[in-house]
Amino acid sequence: MGKDPRKPRGKMSSYAYFVQTRREEHKKKHPEASVNFSEFSKKCSERWKTMSAKEKGKFEDLAKLDKVRYEREMRSYIPPKGEKKKRFKDPNAPKRPSSAFFIFCADFRPQVKGETPGLSIGDVAKKLGEKWNNLTAEDKVPYEKKASRLKEKYEKDITAYRNKGKVPVSMPAKAAAPAKDDDDDDDDDDDDEDDDDDDDEDDE
């Protein structure tokens, strides 16, 4: 199935806005020059790493605004028949817990980057994977225990989160049914009394 042209454009990250700005600047300076995408991406990545938080600020603001735009448009977007609507992620929902491997990565990523500066994200991940595979089962235990605790906490949090928005099923509607029958019985009794009165009048 082709892409739905009415589907909202995906949200852009602060880095994507930075790259877009750099590309536009490059086109203005060199309108006729062709761009080596790989080389251009590498330069953008290097420049982004050396930028201060203040320099990145305007791009982060643009990303925040675009996120608001995207979330607003996705709420009102109705996908074509046969295509499932992408489930909107509630930012307040509990985040899924990290696995033992990801907890290990968070601990050792700075070390790997420090040992080999300039590594790409992919190469860092590869080295972390190798380190993890070289660990003994005993060495992995602390990370697995932490992951287990995080999973238990997540399961409690997600249950509480799901129940928070639910309205409990009330019983009054069912309880009202017998009451209605009682009323009907009362009406029948009244009818019977009326009939008795009529009979008395006939006897007179």
Curated annotation (Swiss-Prot):
GO annotations of cellular component type: chromatin; nucleus
Region (Disordered): 162-204
Gene3D superfamilies, alphabetized: High mobility group box domain (1.10.30.10)
Annotation: DNA-binding region: 8-78, 94-162
Primary site of residence: nucleus
GO BP, sorted A to Z: regulation of transcription by RNA polymerase II
UniProt keyword annotation of Repeat present: yes
GO molecular function: double-stranded DNA binding
Keyword Cell membrane: no
Keyword entries, A-Z: Chromosome, DNA-binding, Nucleus, Repeat
Location of the protein in the cell: Nucleus; Chromosome
Chain intervals with Acidic residues compositional bias: 181-204
Stated role: Binds preferentially single-stranded DNA and unwinds double-stranded DNA.
Recorded family membership: Belongs to the HMGB family.
Protein name as annotated: High mobility group-T protein
